[in-house]
């Protein structure tokens, strides 16, 4: 059962935390039933389930970033300007992604004027310290593409919304009963508003999917990519992409729900008399630099696969598996221009006659038979045992088409490969900082312990990656020719933003951080959420899987509180 703190205990708690609380300010104490760190789709899954399934339970949610949309947690791509010009959305994504660990770089510039200041060439004379860089990060072990999005809604403000069902080989370590987890995945599908039919009427969708279905073996299972998206009924040219707001529903209207922004969750405070209980969360208001305390009965951390273990580490909650068993997907990418034969077939296909005729009537000089507002393709080639990678054939923000190619005939190919699970693949954190400011190798720019990656791909990973690249070039050649400047390439490690395993769930407290309900081992009232909870190597997008785990975790929170 949850413990309840008296005023005397609260005062004692404040006094014991005095070393962390801002001494020159009056401490602020907030009281709630459930405290949630983070505001992405996983945090919102917890909030939604708890509010919907209780009558009096209060939820207090803290987000380190700001609210950048008038709608709490909305997907930025719902903006008309980005639906009209997808390629411009890349600037939003790049602006939202903050690198996690930047390894030192060679600062020698041979063409710099001698009169200009430059750091010493001899390291013995001192080294340049660049704010935000991590001197402890070995470049060869880094995930340089890995980043954090600090905003209300998290990465769901700019994600692709792909929500495939994981293959059985992507859930071999799942401690949840298969039948139960299948049901959780279906519930996650509903919560994320996943559809597989919103692009069925698109000319490009039809011709790309049919070309692949007719050319590849049927065992590849070419199909429509399941997406968290719904076409608008008032104007079908546009769609509504799923964001954290979709998951949250009407929760923001509830007087039992509080969201604070630009507030860092510094650490959790464990009871001195009962080490299985967290009694409070220490927060830092980043606008005022004042510290605050949230006293609750249950606590949930859902701040991403790196920031969640970061907070646990800073709280001196350090299970052996914390940050270990890190798995990240490899990624290959290219863009193609559709074959002339595919494009020419559109003009003569009776299924498209009405659309083509209307387009030609309106734009008689256009040599392409594809209407300007025709939706992009959204095709998936799912993971199979023979081809253990996940494939998306579509058009998204990354990849600059440029002025010489019409985006209507450009298609992106993204292949995602899994990695072997290795305990030594991990993220570690700097020592507990005494000062809440940036310190090279000690803290990140938000004053939390600096993450450092130690990740290698195995030889087996390399073999799979090579096969995956070969498969991508084969698929590309089926569809068309490479767009100049966007040839087949491996993307920077970490760019997939699909890290798993850092707070993995399981039954053994030595090889996992939390139990099958995502409750941290040896704690009664502390839960974790997010892709880090996934104990498997995955190739498909992990969000739907993480939401499924979060639904089970939220049920456990409600059960723990003993409310209905």
UniProtKB/Swiss-Prot annotation:
Cofactor comment text: Binds 1 FAD covalently per subunit.
Cofactor: FAD
Sites of Tele-8alpha-FAD histidine modification: 158
Gene3D superfamilies membership: FAD/NAD(P)-binding domain
pH-activity profile: Optimum pH is 7.5-8.0. Active from pH 6 to 10. Stable from pH 5 to 11.
Regions annotated as coiled coil: none
Disulfide-linked positions: none
Reaction(s) the record says it catalyses: D-glucose + O2 = 2-dehydro-D-glucose + H2O2
Keywords annotated in UniProt: FAD, Flavoprotein, Oxidoreductase
Function: Catalyzes the oxidation of various aldopyranoses and disaccharides on carbon-2 to the corresponding 2-keto sugars concomitant with the reduction of O(2) to H(2)O(2). The preferred substrate is D-glucose which is converted to 2-dehydro-D-glucose. Acts also on D-xylose, L-sorbose, D-galactose and 1,5-anhydroglucitol, a diagnostic marker of diabetes mellitus.
Family the UniProt entry places it in: Belongs to the GMC oxidoreductase family.
Name of this protein: Pyranose 2-oxidase
């Amino acid at each position: 059962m949850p413990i309840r703190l008296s005023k005397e205990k609260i005062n004692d708690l404040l006094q014991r935390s005095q070393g962390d609380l801002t001494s020159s300010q009056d401490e602020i104490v907030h009281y709630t039933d459930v405290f949630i760190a983070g505001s992405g789709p996983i945090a919102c899954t917890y909030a939604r389930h708890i509010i919907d399934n209780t009558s009096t339970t209060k939820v207090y949610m803290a987000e380190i970033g700001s609210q950048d949309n008038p709608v709490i947690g909305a997907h930025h791509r719902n903006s008309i300007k980005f639906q009209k010009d997808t390629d411009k959305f890349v600037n939003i994504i790049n602006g939202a992604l903050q690198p996690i660990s930047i390894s030192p770089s060679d600062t020698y510039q041979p063409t710099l004027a001698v009169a200009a200041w430059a750091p010493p060439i001899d390291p013995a004379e001192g080294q340049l310290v660049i704010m935000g860089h991590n001197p402890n990060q070995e470049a060869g072990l880094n995930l340089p593409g890995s980043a954090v999005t600090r905003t209300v809604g998290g990465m769901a403000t700019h994600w692709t919304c792909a929500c495939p069902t994981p293959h059985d080989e992507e859930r071999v370590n799942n401690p949840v009963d298969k039948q139960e987890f299948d049901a959780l995945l279906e519930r996650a599908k509903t919560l994320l508003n996943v559809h597989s039919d919103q692009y069925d009427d698109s000319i490009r969708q039809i011709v790309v999917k049919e070309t692949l279905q007719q050319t590849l073996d049927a065992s590849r299972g070419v199909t429509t990519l399941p997406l968290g998206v719904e076409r608008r009924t008032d104007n079908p040219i546009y769609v509504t992409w799923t964001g954290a707001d979709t998951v949250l529903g009407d929760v923001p209207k509830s007087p039992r729900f509080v969201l604070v922004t630009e507030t860092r969750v510094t650490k959790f405070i464990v009871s001195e008399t009962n080490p299985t209980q967290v009694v409070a969360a220490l927060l830092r208001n980043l606008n005022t630099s004042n510290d605050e305390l949230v006293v609750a009965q249950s606590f949930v951390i859902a701040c991403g696969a790196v920031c969640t273990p970061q907070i646990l580490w800073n709280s001196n909650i350090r299970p052996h598996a914390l940050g270990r068993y890190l798995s990240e997907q490899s990624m290959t990418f290219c863009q193609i221009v559709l074959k002339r034969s595919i494009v020419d077939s559109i003009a003569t296909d009776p299924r498209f006659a009405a659309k083509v005729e209307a387009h030609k009537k309106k734009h008689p000089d256009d040599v392409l038979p594809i209407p300007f507002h025709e939706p992009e393709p959204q095709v998936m080639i799912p993971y199979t045992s023979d081809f253990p990678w996940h494939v998306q054939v579509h058009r998204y923000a990354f990849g600059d088409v440029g002025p010489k190619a019409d985006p209507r005939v450009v298609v992106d190919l993204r292949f995602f490969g899994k990695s072997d699970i290795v305990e030594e693949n991990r993220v570690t954190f700097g020592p507990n900082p005494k000062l809440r400011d940036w310190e090279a190798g000690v803290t990140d720019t938000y004053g939390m312990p600096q993450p450092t990656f130690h990740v290698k791909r195995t030889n087996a990973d390399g073999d799979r990656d090579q096969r995956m690249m070969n498969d991508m070039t084969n698929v590309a050649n089926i569809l068309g020719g490479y767009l100049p400047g966007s040839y087949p390439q491996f993307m920077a490690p970490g760019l997939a933003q699909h890290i798993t395993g850092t707070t993995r769930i399981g039954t053994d407290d030595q090889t996992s951080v939390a139990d099958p309900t995502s409750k941290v081992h040896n704690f009664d009232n502390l839960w974790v959420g997010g892709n880090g909870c996934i104990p498997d190597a995955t190739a498909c997008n992990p969000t739907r899987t993480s939401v499924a785990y979060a639904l089970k975790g939220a049920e456990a929170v409600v059960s723990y509180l003993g409310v209905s």
